[in-house]
Each structure stands twice: as structure tokens, then as C-alpha cells.
């Protein structure tokens, strides 16, 4: 815990008592805080960071909607739900990665072999998560309809337990949970998101934070970009640090990190088109009721130069 990280709750407004700005940063397990701490990316801050960790993107999106956090990492699917709910939030940076680790998992001894075998089966995942997204893409790509499977909405810890105990047939999740399940041999990948998903995630921020703390957000995004570049130059060091910070075996940390191959990219026409495709898919399967134009969900004025 560096001295630059604000451990206490910030005073009302954007500025702490000592006159330094405060960034209320949401995060997920094994996310930006772990990356920045491992890379030394929190040194020399001109502002304090008040961290809040969430078990999944959906509660993080709710926190953004409530302005409980200023910014945080969120997947393409949860961003769609946030837009549909009227959340005043925008993506300020885009990240592309290999989607293998966003996957539908089954027990090692499961008789299920393909996505088509999920017909009539129960699948645990978070509502509105990328796990929910890969579930729907997997079953529709196999010719099934959403109502031909039983989706049970559970948080990751509960979903993992349900799969292990046999109360569900499958668990749709993401990294680092997928790598951890594989390394511990508690589950195997039935269907991966590779080839099904565009592999997009974002750093999102509230409209209010963008208006009031734009230089802080730009600096924070740039630190994240630089930390990620550092991580791929120092795979072993980062994997060891990630394992220590989030409490998972080093081999699981390294597995999920190496295969994700993440890269921050500019928010361009292709990113927006891919996000529009996700929104259109959700309309197609009935999860959102109205057509959505996603262009307004992006602020293209933030740079991501390495």
C-alpha cells in the first residue's frame, strides 16, 4: 500500500483536505490496482486514489451509475447494460484481448462435449456480465435458443461452489477464474470465447468525473497503458506479483496473463462497430428492449499512447 493511495474515505467533492484531487477508482479482482502496483505505476501521483473492489462488472457498473466511483474497468457487455439503463458513463479507453479465458466451464468428469450439449442444462453466471454474453453467444452459435438452457444468476464465488457441488452443470466466467479453475483441476473449458467475442473491455468514467477530473483520468489511463506494456516485458515478475496481490497460484496468474495478450487501443470506428454488434446481439436475444446507438457511450478525446 503506497502512501500515494488514499486509504480513507475522501471528503465530499473532488479535492481532499490537503488540496489534492481524489480519484474514486473501482476495480475487479486482479485488475488495474494489481497491475499498477506490480509495475510501480502508482509512484509520483499528483492525486490520491480511493480504491473500491467489486466481484464483477455489474456491481461496478451500478457504482458508476450511483457516482460511488469515478472510473473503473468494465467489459463490453456490461457497458451495454449500463447504456440501456441510462447510466451517465462513457468509455475513455479500449482494451482488446484474446477471449479464450471468457468461457463456459464444466466439471472435469462432465459428459458435456460441445455447446449443443448445454440444451436443457443449468449454467451459472453473473447477470449482464461477459460470462452471460459468452453463454448466449455459445448457445445461439450452436443453434439453441436462450430459453433452451437454464441460466442461474450467481456471483463468481457462489457459481464456482455450485459447479463444484453439482447443483449446476456449467459456469460461464472470465479470467482469472478460468485459469484458476483449470490449474486447480476443478473445471475444464467446454466453450471458449475465442472466435465468439470481440475481446473488448474498457476503462469507463462517469460524465461528472470526465467533466471535473479530466486531467486526472487522462493521467490514470496513461499509467494503466504504461503498466500493461511493462507487464509484457516482465511476464514472470508481473505474474508473481499478481499471484501475491490477488492470492492465486503463480501458475494460474501466468496462464491467464499470457493468453489474454491485452493491448490498449484507440477508440476508433472498429471499436465502436464491434460494440454496436454486441448491442444488436442483445436486442436480438431479447435482453434489451430498444435499439441502442452506442456512439454516445464513447469519449474519443483520451489518448492511449504507449
Question: Which sequence ranges carry the predicted segments?
Answer:
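N-terminal export signals
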Residues: 1-17
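Solvent-exposed, polar/charged alpha-helical surfaces in well-ordered, non-transmembrane soluble domains
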Residues: 34, 62, 66, 80, ...
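Soluble non-cytosolic domains of exported or imported proteins
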Residues: 55-58, 73, 125, 129, ...
Amino acid at each position: 500500500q503506497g502512501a500515494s493511495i488514499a486509504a480513507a474515505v475522501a471528503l465530499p467533492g473532488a479535492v481532499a483536505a490537503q488540496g489534492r484531487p481524489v480519484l474514486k477508482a473501482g476495480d475487479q479482482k486482479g485488475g488495474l490496482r494489481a497491475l499498477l502496483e506490480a509495475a510501480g505505476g502508482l509512484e509520483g501521483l499528483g492525486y490520491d486514489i480511493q480504491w473500491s473492489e467489486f466481484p464483477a462488472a455489474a456491481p461496478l457498473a451500478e457504482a458508476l451509475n450511483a457516482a460511488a466511483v469515478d472510473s473503473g474497468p468494465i467489459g463490453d457487455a456490461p457497458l451495454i447494460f449500463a447504456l440501456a439503463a441510462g447510466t451517465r458513463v462513457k468509455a475513455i479507453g479500449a482494451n482488446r484481448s484474446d477471449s479464450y479465458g471468457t468461457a463456459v466451464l464444466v466439471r472435469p468428469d462432465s459428459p458435456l462435449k460441445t455447446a449443443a450439449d448445454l440444451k436443457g442444462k443449468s449454467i451459472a453466471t453473473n447477470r449482464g456480465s461477459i460470462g452471460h454474453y459468452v453463454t448466449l453467444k455459445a448457445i445461439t452459435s450452436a443453434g439453441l435458443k436462450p430459453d433452451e438452457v437454464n441460466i442461474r444468476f450467481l456471483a463468481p464465488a457462489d457459481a464456482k461452489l455450485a459447479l463444484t457441488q453439482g447443483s449446476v452443470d456449467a459456469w460461464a466466467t472470465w479470467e482469472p477464474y478460468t485459469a484458476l479453475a483449470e490449474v486447480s483441476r476443478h473445471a475444464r473449458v467446454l466453450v471458449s470465447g475465442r472466435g465468439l467475442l470481440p475481446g473488448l473491455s474498457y476503462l469507463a468514467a462517469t460524465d461528472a468525473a470526465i467533466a471535473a477530473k479530466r486531467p486526472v483520468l487522462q493521467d490514470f489511463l496513461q499509467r494503466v497503458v504504461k503498466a500493461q506494456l511493462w507487464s509484457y516485458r516482465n511476464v514472470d515478475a508481473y505474474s508473481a506479483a499478481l499471484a501475491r496481490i490477488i492470492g492465486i497460484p503463480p501458475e494460474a496468474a501466468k496462464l491467464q496473463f499470457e493468453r489474454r495478450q491485452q493491448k490498449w487501443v484507440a477508440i476508433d470506428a472498429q471499436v465502436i462497430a464491434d460494440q454496436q454488434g454486441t448491442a444488436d446481439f442483445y436486442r436480438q436475444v431479447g435482453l434489451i428492449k430498444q435499439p441502442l446507438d452506442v456512439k454516445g457511450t464513447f469519449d474519443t478525446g483520451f489518448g492511449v499512447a504507449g
